[in-house]
Every structure is written in structure tokens, then in C-alpha cells.
Amino acid sequence: MIRIGHGFDVHAFGGEGPIIIGGVAIPYEKGLLAHSDGDVALHALTDALLGAVALGDIGKLFPDTDMQYKGADSRGLLREAYTQVQAKGYKVGNVDVTIIAQAPKMRPHIDAMRAAIAEDLACDIEQVNVKATTSERLGFTGRGEGIACEAVALVVKS
């Protein structure tokens, strides 16, 4: 059996950088406002994986009202969520992540993001796709107010 999940996340810019996206620190003059480390890519991916096996979302598993997750490393959250996906008898078939940001440029960091995600999900890097786009200067991402991300995860019965 295969199942598909979709995830979305957004964080506004605020404070000082760097930012963490896809598990990779990216130099930037602005930071991202968040309860955890603000990694929109891993948050969207975590939601996609949890959704694929009907385990809710990242906020249910790691509530932002719980101080133990203040400043949390999103790679650790992703790994914990994936452990729960595996406990339901599923493993990653493939994942696809789309980062939406006017700046900073993501292309130089994509390979490192793919490697980090593949490591966290204990899968082959060929099962992980990460891409970036802009919103052509439209909306909050186009105005440089924040970053958004969508992710899709296909999981297969182990």
C-alpha cells in the first residue's frame, strides 16, 4: 500500500540570520521568527510525512506551547516524526520539497539539503528532491517578508 501526504509551512523574517532551511544553515542578514529553529522545509516535510499516515501535524506532535521545543532543531523533530511513521509500518518512497522565497538564493544549498534530509530519513538521496522558486515578487514571499514551503511525501508499506 502507498500513501501520500502534503505539508505546508511559512515563517516571517525577523531578527538576525543565519536561517536554517532543509537542515542547512544559510547565511542571511535576517532570521526567521519561530518557536523552534524556523526550518520551513523540514516543518512542511514533517507535516507531509505525518499526514501520509494520518498522524496529524507537527503542531500536534510538537506543540509550540511546550517549552521543551523552544529553539528545537527541526532535524530532530523530523527524525522523531519519521520514527512514528515507521512504527505504523511505513517507509519513505520519495519526498519532494518546494521552497518559495525571493531571497536568499537556495540553489547553492540544495545538494546539502537533500543530503541532510536523506540522512534523517535513512533513505537514498535519489528519494529526496528539493527545489526552490520565487513568487515573482508577488505576495509576502515576493515582498521579502518571509519564506514558505510545500512538501509532498509518498510512503510505502514496509
Swiss-Prot record:
Annotated organism of origin: Pasteurella multocida (strain Pm70)
The entry's keywords: Isoprene biosynthesis, Lyase, Metal-binding
EC number: 4.6.1.12
Site (Transition state stabilizer): 35, 134
UniProt pathway annotation: Isoprenoid biosynthesis; isopentenyl diphosphate biosynthesis via DXP pathway; isopentenyl diphosphate from 1-deoxy-D-xylulose 5-phosphate: step 4/6
PANTHER family (UniProt xref): 2-C-METHYL-D-ERYTHRITOL 2,4-CYCLODIPHOSPHATE SYNTHASE, CHLOROPLASTIC
Xref: Gene3D superfamilies: 2-C-methyl-D-erythritol 2,4-cyclodiphosphate synthase
Reactions catalysed, as given in the entry: 4-CDP-2-C-methyl-D-erythritol 2-phosphate = 2-C-methyl-D-erythritol 2,4-cyclic diphosphate + CMP
Residues binding 4-CDP-2-C-methyl-D-erythritol 2-phosphate: 9-11, 35-36, 57-59, 62-66, 133-136, 140, 143
Xref: SUPFAM superfamilies: IpsF-like
Known role: Involved in the biosynthesis of isopentenyl diphosphate (IPP) and dimethylallyl diphosphate (DMAPP), two major building blocks of isoprenoid compounds. Catalyzes the conversion of 4-diphosphocytidyl-2-C-methyl-D-erythritol 2-phosphate (CDP-ME2P) to 2-C-methyl-D-erythritol 2,4-cyclodiphosphate (ME-CPP) with a corresponding release of cytidine 5-monophosphate (CMP).
GO terms (BP aspect): isopentenyl diphosphate biosynthetic process, methylerythritol 4-phosphate pathway; terpenoid biosynthetic process
UniProt name for this protein: 2-C-methyl-D-erythritol 2,4-cyclodiphosphate synthase
Similarity field: Belongs to the IspF family.
Leader sequence segment: none
Gene coding for it: ispF
Alphabetized Pfam families for the sequence: YgbB
Cofactor(s) required, per the database record: a divalent metal cation
Subunit structure: Homotrimer.
Coiled coil: none
Top-level EC class: lyase
Co-factor binding details: Binds 1 divalent metal cation per subunit.
UniProt GO MF annotations: 2-C-methyl-D-erythritol 2,4-cyclodiphosphate synthase activity; metal ion binding
Binding site for a divalent metal cation: 9, 11, 43
